[in-house]
Every structure is written in C-alpha cells, then in structure tokens.
C-alpha cells in the first residue's frame, strides 16, 4: 500500500514557491520544504517523483503569478496594452525579485526556448506601428532589452526609481524607436 498523503501537491508547491519568494530558488530542498511544512522530506518525495518535478512546478506557478500581474496591469488601463506589458515586467521584478530571477535571470542552458508572449508582443507592435514582421520583431527586441535592463536593476536592488519615471522612460524608448523606424 502506498504511503498516506499528509500534504497535497498544491500545498507542497505553495510552500516551495513561498521559500523561493523569500530565499531564492536555491532554497528549495526537500528538507527545507518539509521543515516549512513541519515534517520531514518524506511527503515531498511521496508527492513528487523528483525534486526536478517540484522545481518545474514552482517555475510554472511563478510564471502564472507573472501572467496574473501582467493581465491585471493591462486591465487596469493606466497604460496602453503594449506599455502595460513592460510596466508589469518591471513591477514584477520590483515586487517579486526572487521569482523574477527564477523566470528571467536563470541559466537556460539545455532548456527549450520559451516564448513568454514574444509573438503576441510582436503582433501588437505590428498593429500599432504598421511595421512588417521582421521590423516589428527587431523593434520589440530593442524595447525588451531596455525593459529587461530596468527590471534587472529593480530585481537586484540596484535602483528603486519611481514608476512614473519608468513610465516616462518607456514612452521615450518607444517614441524614439518608432521615429527611427518611420525615418527609415
């Protein structure tokens, strides 16, 4: 007979996500997750075939939190949709630095490419600017590099700018690139 389940997969994932939020992804060990649950590591291995499986579930949950923040930011309507995506990315880095590091600053060697909404963003740029696919892709990549740089500075506590200043900068990046594209 299999061991009795003391904690659900969801409880274990939630605990592992909270550990990641507080201490970073490296803090996820079966022993530490078990200790946080007030037990041994055994329930972790009962619920998951391996730590890799649990870590994959934590990444999925972190991405779901990011998507939720992005959707919330877009639906608030404070910024145009494309800008909202950048503002949400930076806000996620500011509010959830360890989850941001997990999703967007970890070594990807050996991992499959993840789109993370790239094609949707390129389509949005095409619609807003009238650029062809290749030009819109370059445009978005250049914007994303600037947004990612600001987000990394927030996630690493290098700076803590006011979000209105960040908004102004994103507008400047967008308008500058758009002006250059039109001139070409």
Task: Tell me what each language-model feature is.
Residues 56, 60-84, 121-128:
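Amphipathic alpha-helical linker/stalk segments
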Residues 104-142, 167-176:
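Amphipathic alpha-helical packing segments from all-alpha helical-bundle domains
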Residues 20, 53-62, 103, 107, ...:
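Alpha-helical DNA-contacting segments of helix-turn-helix folds
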Residues 95, 99-105, 145-162, 175-184:
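Amphipathic C-terminal alpha-helical segment
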Residues 12-20, 62, 66, 89, ...:
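Short hydrophobic clusters on alpha-helical segments that form packing/core surfaces
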Residues 11, 15, 19-53, 57:
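Helix-turn-helix
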Residues 71-98, 133, 143:
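Hydrophobic alpha-helical connector segments
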